[in-house]
Amino acid sequence: MKLHNNKENFIEVIQIVSRSLNISPSLIEKDYYVTMILKSINDEVSGLIFKGGTSLSKCHKAINRFSEDIDLTLDSEHLTEGQRKIVKPAIIKTCKNLGLTINNIEETRSRRDYNCYQISYPLLFKNDEVNPVIKVEVVFIQECYPDEIKKADSIIGEWLKANGFSKQAENYDLFSFDIHVQTIERTLIDKVFALCDYMISNNLQKHSRHIYDIYQLLKKVELNNEFNLLVNRVREDRKYNSLCVSAQDGADIPSLLKRVIETECYKKDYETNTIMMLYAPCSYEEAITGLKVIVESGMFQENDEYKKIRYIYLFQFLRKLKVIKNIEYLKCHQKAIITNILIKFKTVLLA
């Protein structure tokens, strides 16, 4: 039996946990449904990877804020057309079993690289700051790596176990569960690029949360050579998405971050929206210091290692096309090779 099916018990438990943790009951209620949806989809879909802000709080325990969206993708092994078609039916089945409604089901398509399912739940605790809709975003545009297995839990489930109510947690299916989740290192990198992209497009509203997340993640992530290599690899992958402007050739991440700091373009949104979602206070002035650390670290500066990775990616691509066999040849004849490929593609397109 699910806890929300017993309305009186559900309300009582939420109120008790709310008083104990000093967290708004509406946030606890929404977190419960986020967790139940995530658990059910994870049970239905092989190769599922959980990523984004909610994974940071729910699995990594790296941030102390409420995150309401579920970001999902598939690992490279399961990223096939057949497996992608399984995701939508799994979400539909999940919502049916939990008694929830997908508001925009007719707008979603299994073949798309991106779908956002907007799921409504029966609201018991009203709060103007909390939207009673859970977004499940399924993205197949970029490969998700690296990942690891972590435990996921709801606020209610975690509280019940910590306070000697394990039996009740078991009865209501509120035990934690294993799920593949993107590492915090990769998520930190994605958030730095995303923060720059949103600034470039002047899409600032509700994106200042990335500043808070970056600040908190820096407490757990070691900025070393391995991290720098991952930055370069992610930059090269993001480059193939035209919306990822900050990953394109010539974009200077440190300069973009300095602009964010100097213009304070995210400050108003941070103090209006992000700060309302925090379980523990963290001022804008404190959070923005994380960007200064990133700038001074040099981790996002284009360097010789990044140039090597670009050569390797290009070499692998050209080798698949059976154009070259030796990377040294690539270094010496890169311009001529690319020109030759463009001529061949043009010939094919005009044929």
Q: Can you annotate each of these PLM segments?
A:
Residues 50-54:
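Glycine-rich beta-strand-to-loop/alpha-helix junction loops that act as flexible
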Residues 323, 328, 336, 348-351:
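Acidic, Ala/Val/Gly-enriched low-complexity intrinsically disordered segments
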Residues 1-48, 58-64, 75-324:
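Structured mid-to-C-terminal alpha-helical surface segments
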Residues 314-318, 330-334, 342:
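Short hydrophobic targeting helices and cationic amphipathic motifs
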Residues 110, 329-330, 339:
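Short, often N-terminal, low-complexity regions
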